[in-house]
């Protein structure tokens, strides 16, 4: 539990109202009650302030006078909410040690935690305070930086590198073979050995069941601060710039480079051998088929509509070339 003046002392902001007001958790405007700290990050929800039962709220300067509740005024209420949530929900503390049911073939620091069923191969390097969850598999020669945490059943293949303070969620696979095959004249396939690595920077979070393939010759590189959601597929030799965030079910084909601070919406697809510059936003469901060389927001999908309307519009779309030819002919006739 924190008093409002304690929060402001730690995190900044302007405090209006009783500084001794105590809060024990953060909550939404609709669900907040006694002892809760709510936040208003989107102005379209400001009408909900009137019925809010929170003990205090976090507001932007433009909304400071919309309520008489004790409040913290800050330039970015959503960031402030995130910082407060971190205070109320610190990371789980783990007891160092190696479970008797773990298999460890490399020397590890005394500060690490290795759970039951985990397997650590030879020549593995674990930094201080690393946590290896149950059922994880760490391949020969892999490197994991200090403070990183692997949840259950994560697999890191041989020679891959994970930086400091990373979080990898359950079922993620880092360093499996990339999809590399050469086609014979008879249509059969010859497997190309994937001899690169996956190299991941510091402070990266990787969602559940996300897969990152090792490079064919060069490395697959995920830069520091990148945030990956669940069930993302990243092909071999992909490079992702610092602090880029990618939502769930995105597929990125091999040898594509994505810049820093990009945001990729859920279920987007990016074909191989493209370049996307820094500060690009790709909308959900968009298929990227060519390089993006200017920052901005890019969308290539249709908004939802009723089925009957969609069928009618799609029928017109199938005849688009003919319609264009008819319009062009009419324009030429009019010009004469």
Swiss-Prot record:
Gene Ontology CC, one term: membrane
GO terms for MF: N-acyltransferase activity
Active-site residues, Swiss-Prot/TrEMBL: 236 (proton acceptor)
Associated pathway: Bacterial outer membrane biogenesis; LPS lipid A biosynthesis
The keyword Repeat is assigned to this record: yes
Gene3D superfamilies cross-referenced by the UniProt entry: Hexapeptide repeat proteins, MurE/MurF, N-terminal domain
EC number: 2.3.1.191
Catalytic activity field: a UDP-3-O-[(3R)-3-hydroxyacyl]-alpha-D-glucosamine + a (3R)-hydroxyacyl-[ACP] = a UDP-2-N,3-O-bis[(3R)-3-hydroxyacyl]-alpha-D-glucosamine + holo-[ACP] + H(+)
Gene Ontology terms describing biological process: lipid A biosynthetic process
Presence of the UniProt keyword Transcription regulation in the record: no
Pfam family, one: Hexapep_2
PANTHER family (alphabetical): UDP-3-O-ACYLGLUCOSAMINE N-ACYLTRANSFERASE, UDP-3-O-ACYLGLUCOSAMINE N-ACYLTRANSFERASE 1, MITOCHONDRIAL-RELATED
Protein family: Belongs to the transferase hexapeptide repeat family. LpxD subfamily.
Subunit structure: Homotrimer.
Physiological role: Catalyzes the N-acylation of UDP-3-O-acylglucosamine using 3-hydroxyacyl-ACP as the acyl donor. Is involved in the biosynthesis of lipid A, a phosphorylated glycolipid that anchors the lipopolysaccharide to the outer membrane of the cell.
Protein's recorded name: UDP-3-O-acylglucosamine N-acyltransferase
